[in-house]
Regions:
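Helix-to-loop junction immediately C-terminal to a conserved catalytic motif
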Residues: 7
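Conserved ABC transporter NBD signature motif
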Residues: 15-26, 30-31
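Catalytic Walker B motif of ABC-type/P-loop ATPase nucleotide-binding domains
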Residues: 108-112
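Helix N-cap at the start of a conserved alpha-helix in ABC-type nucleotide-binding domains
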Residues: 119-121
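ABC transporter nucleotide-binding domain
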Residues: 125-212
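Short, charged/small-residue-rich alpha-helical element at the C-terminal edge
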Residues: 179-251
Length: 252
């Protein structure tokens, strides 16, 4: 819904929505000249070939790069001669991605862009996003594949039931939840389990344990550990999936 409102495909119920200092609804035609879009529910012309479809989409946008298109076709290994109706879900997705990535614009608006792609094609997509970032292009990526967002995003917005519940860099969001600690010491590790700031305690043997700790308690832990002879200390920051799930569980 948010993406559709930004593109002027839906009218907002209240508030202000603008892109490039232009009203998303009133100035949508002007905004579209600066935006490439891959929808989550990609619908194409069944009787056109893949090549014809890409050419048409690029022509409609008006700022396509033929050389870049050919490069992307080769990278994504797409047969342009086949009709769209014969394409798999993944190949249909490639059509949309090639058409969007082959145009030069200021904002690339991608809604579930890797749906249907195999891991190799996902890797190629990620390389293309890295290229756009180097060119200082803006990319808005909507995805339920949190590992993908974690690899690609500079800033993350978590939306739940239509409202923004968290927003910031991944590093900023990690401060909101717990890190996982793997600890091995030469002396007995058990006394640590009784500390009030230690959670999810799992003892491997008398010298090793795994547990979690809030960001604000990290200094307390390090102070306590000065009394131990440490053989191994591994601190794993939370993944985006862990951040999301913990926030969801707290809300429930």
């Amino acid at each position: 819904t948010t993406i559709r409102i930004m593109l002027g495909l839906l009218k907002k119920s209240k508030g202000i929505v603008s892109l490039f200092d232009k009203d998303a609804w009133r100035d949508s035609l002007d905004i579209h000249k600066s935006v490439a879009y891959v929808p989550g529910d990609l619908t194409l012309w069944e009787n056109l070939t893949g090549g014809q479809t890409i050419d048409l989409l690029m022509k409609l946008h008006g700022n396509g790069d033929e050389a870049k298109k050919q490069e992307l076709v080769k990278k994504f290994n797409l047969d342009l001669s086949k009709k769209v109706k014969s394409y798999s879900k993944g190949n249909r997705q490639k059509v949309g991605l090639i058409a969007a990535l082959a145009v030069d614009c200021d904002l690339y608006n991608l809604d579930e862009p890797t749906s249907g792609l195999d891991p190799l094609m996902e890797s190629i997509f990620q390389d293309e996003i890295a290229r756009l970032k180097k060119q200082q292009k803006a990319v808005l990526l909507s995805s339920h594949i949190l590992s993908e967002v974690e690899r690609l995003a500079d800033r993350v917005v978590i939306i739940q039931e239509g409202s923004v519940v968290e927003s910031g860099t991944l590093e900023e969001l990690r401060h909101l939840t717990r890190s996982t600690i793997h600890l091995k010491v030469t002396n007995e590790v058990t006394p640590l389990s009784s500390l009030h700031f230690i959670h999810d305690w799992s003892q491997i043997d008398q010298n090793q344990a795994t547990f979690s700790i809030d960001h604000l308690s990290m200094d307390n832990l390090l102070q306590v550990l000065t009394e131990y002879q440490i053989q191994k200390l591994e601190i794993l920051p939370p993944t985006l999936e862990e951040l999301f799930m913990r926030h969801y569980q707290v809300q429930k």
